Curated annotation (Swiss-Prot):
ATP binds at residues 17, 210-214, 285-287, 333-337. Homodimer. This is Acetate kinase. It is found in: Cytoplasm. InterPro entries: Ac/propionate_kinase (IPR004372), Aliphatic_acid_kin_short-chain (IPR000890), Aliphatic_acid_kinase_CS (IPR023865), ATPase_NBD (IPR043129). Mg(2+) binds at residues 10, 387. It comes from Wigglesworthia glossinidia brevipalpis. GO terms for molecular function: acetate kinase activity; ATP binding; magnesium ion binding. Belongs to the acetokinase family. The active site is at residue 150.
Length: 399
């Protein structure tokens, strides 16, 4: 076992994903998730080597209690691992315009994360809890906490893509612009894709699709991101599990002025009650759509809307890549596993030079990676993401 391990924390609005990784060998010694935080059924699931465990937390446990459980009830029982943790890597969804690369967390970085809360209102507050609790639990590592920003990969986006067509004053005064998200994942799979395609990353033109409960698409020109579908917040873009993605802004005025729905309620509707959940009124889980779209008209409608929006982004982004597209990449829980969705989507892209290989498309899921199109097609690849490994590799640099 290496003497230098990294504890990776991804604190979400109601969950904490955690892992202990050796950045050099890429081995994951511990991984798990505390979920349903602040609810009655809060629990922790984790894996050590090949052994799986699960435990209930106290009812309505918050992030602080969950982190204490992770350290006291999991890591403390693996002291050979605990004593070799030399740094803590934190995934940060939005670092604003000032945080352009991974960095040690100090007061200045903490202020930037706080100032960016309006742009990631569900995520950044949770990240701060994770950081401050890490300071308390690991006082010996207080100067070894590293922020790895989802927005950093998107800092290469030019202003003709990140500016909105609203008065320029709002950007200059309040930094209202496109920030994007999932940058850690987009960066990882773009490099993996360039290796598979045997093209240097600095010459790779790709469209990467991170498709999970949240989802985003990025256009990558010569290895650099030049546009992405998420915007000021993670609400913009494609259809997601509970988020609406792109809509006519006038819907907000109609709901508020005509239907007398408060701004707070509208925010909740767009963030937590829309997307696949809103379209089906049953589930935000894409597995329901995959399993039922051939026999259920509601699921079929949701699938078609999802693929229509996604295909529009892919088609539009191809025009930004200077007449050369090396491939598109699917990642995230949906992108890696939803073979029916991938087939429907790629069939929509036939006009652009894509041709699905049904056998490969069916086989390449459940953690497998590879090309799912025919040899005469522009490649479409499935690549499982590994954000935790990226965070660990970025963090070890500062230890």
């Amino acid at each position: 076992m290496s003497q230098n391990l990294i504890l990776v924390l991804n604190c979400g609005s109601s969950s904490i994903k955690f892992s202990v990784i050796d950045p050099k060998t890429e081995k994951k010694y511990i991984s798990g998730i505390a979920e349903c935080l602040k609810l009655k059924e809060s629990s922790v699931k984790w894996k050590i080597d090949k052994s799986y465990h699960e435990s209930s937390l106290n009812e309505y446990s918050d992030h602080n209690l969950a982190l204490r459980f992770i350290v006291n009830e999991i890591l403390q029982h693996k002291k050979d691992i605990l004593k070799k943790i030399v740094g803590i890597g934190h995934r940060i969804v939005n670092g604003g315009i000032k945080c352009t690369k991974s960095t040690i967390i100090d007061e200045k970085i903490l202020k930037n994360i706080k100032d960016s809360i309006p742009f990631a209102p569900l995520h950044n507050p949770a990240h701060l809890i994770g950081i401050y609790e890490s300071f308390k639990i690991f006082p010996n590592l207080i100067n070894k906490n590293v922020a790895v920003f989802d927005t950093a990969f998107h800092q290469t986006i030019p202003e003709d893509s990140y500016l909105y067509a609203i008065p320029y004053y709002f950007y200059k005064k309040y930094n209202i612009r496109r920030y994007g998200a999932h940058g850690i994942s987009h960066s990882y799979v773009s490099k993996k894709a360039s290796n598979i395609l045997n093209i240097p990353i600095e010459k790779s033109n790709l469209i990467t699709c991170h498709l999970g409960n949240g989802g985003s698409v990025s256009a990558i020109l010569n290895g650099k991101c030049i546009d992405t579908s998420m915007g000021l917040t993670p609400l913009e873009g494609i259809v997601m599990g509970t988020r609406c993605g792109d809509i006519d802004p006038s819907i907000i005025f109609y709901l508020h002025e005509k239907l007398k729905i408060s701004v707070k309620e509208i925010r909740e509707i767009f963030s937590e009650k829309s997307g696949l959940l809103g379209l089906t009124n049953i589930s935000s889980d894409f597995r329901y759509i995959e399993d039922n779209f051939l026999k259920n008209k509601i699921a079929k409608r949701a699938m078609k809307i999802y693929c229509n929006r996604l295909s529009k982004y892919i088609g539009a982004y191809i025009t930004l890549l200077e007449n050369k597209l090396d491939g598109i990449v699917f990642t995230g829980g949906i992108g890696e596993n939803a073979y029916n969705m991938r087939e429907l989507l790629i069939n929509k892209l036939k006009i652009l030079g894509f041709e699905i290989n049904k056998e490969k498309n069916f086989k390449i899921r459940l953690g497998r990676s590879g090309i799912i199109t025919n040899s005469n097609s522009i490649p479409a690849l499935v690549i499982p993401t590994n954000e935790e490994l990226v965070i660990a590799k970025e963090s070890i640099i500062f230890t």
